[in-house]
């Protein structure tokens, strides 16, 4: 079996039917013409935010990471492992793709520990066992994995989806693409940066060009590139016609170098 490709979905993608239609059409085309197995990892911040707003619960973020108090983890689990995950499975079904919905704890695929008490139920992801997902891939399934994990003590944890995708890529020896709302990392003039090293990233963070959630994304990608020993792509889901080329390893966004 070829080494898998993990496609991490993020941003408002889950909120846009048009975007999901484009993405799944590209996935169908890719699966028809290539033998390479695919895995989807997703967060669903927009789904969570909508739910929290509807329940009048405050959304608190610290250094770009969502703080998850004990009284909110059940709600966030429901939004990510429930609504967001099953929405993606429904789209797969609509496109005749045999998909299986998972969370990080299934088959111990990704090990999760609590990041820090001050973040509450926020988990740190580490590589786990490839057995379950490899078995699904060998049988032609598309695993769709939410970024909810569980600790050895049985505590549910909300994991940053970029970091969850990195840990799963390390588990499977997979390549990784982080798909988001932006077409890559932009410089101070709004132009896409084709390649990024750790030194360049540090410089842009110091200059205030890379900020907030993008810092988390860039650090996750740098961490992924270092962990995996291969480049990681940050790209946009908005340009469906470019997705098959991107899945084939053509750089379309910002390529993060190890």
Swiss-Prot record:
It catalyses: N-acetyl-L-glutamate + ATP = N-acetyl-L-glutamyl 5-phosphate + ADP. This is Acetylglutamate kinase. It is found in: Cytoplasm. Belongs to the acetylglutamate kinase family. ArgB subfamily. Its EC number is 2.7.2.8. The record marks 8, 217 as: Transition state stabilizer. One of its GO terms (cellular component) is cytoplasm. It comes from the Bacteria. GO terms for molecular function: acetylglutamate kinase activity; ATP binding. It comes from Shigella flexneri serotype 5b (strain 8401). Catalyzes the ATP-dependent phosphorylation of N-acetyl-L-glutamate. Homodimer. Pathway: Amino-acid biosynthesis; L-arginine biosynthesis; N(2)-acetyl-L-ornithine from L-glutamate: step 2/4. It holds the Pfam family AA_kinase.
């Amino acid at each position: 079996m070829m080494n898998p490709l993990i496609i991490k979905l993020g941003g408002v993608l889950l909120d846009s039917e048009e975007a999901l239609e484009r993405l799944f059409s590209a996935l169908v085309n890719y699966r028809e013409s290539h033998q390479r197995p695919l895995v989807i990892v997703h967060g669903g911040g927009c789904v969570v935010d909508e739910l929290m707003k509807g329940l009048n619960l405050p959304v608190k973020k610290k250094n770009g990471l969502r703080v998850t108090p004990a009284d909110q983890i059940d709600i966030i689990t429901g939004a990510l492992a429930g609504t967001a995950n099953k929405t993606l499975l429904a789209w797969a079904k609509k496109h005749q793709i045999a998909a299986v919905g998972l969370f990080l704890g299934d088959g111990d695929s990704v090990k999760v520990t609590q990041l820090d008490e001050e973040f509450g139920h926020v988990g740190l992801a580490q590589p786990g066992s490839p057995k379950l997902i490899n078995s699904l891939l060998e049988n032609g399934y598309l695993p769709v994995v939410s970024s909810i994990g569980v600790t050895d003590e049985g505590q549910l944890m909300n994991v940053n989806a970029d970091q969850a995708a990195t840990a799963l890529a390390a588990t499977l020896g997979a390549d990784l693409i982080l798909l988001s709302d932006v077409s890559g990392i932009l410089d101070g003039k709004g132009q896409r940066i084709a390649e990024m090293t750790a030194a360049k990233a540090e410089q842009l963070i110091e200059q205030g060009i890379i900020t907030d959630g993008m810092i988390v994304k860039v650090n996750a990608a740098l961490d992924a590139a270092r962990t995996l020993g291969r480049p990681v792509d940050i790209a946009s889901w908005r340009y469906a016609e470019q997705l098959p080329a991107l899945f084939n390893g053509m750089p379309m966004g910002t390529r993060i170098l190890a």
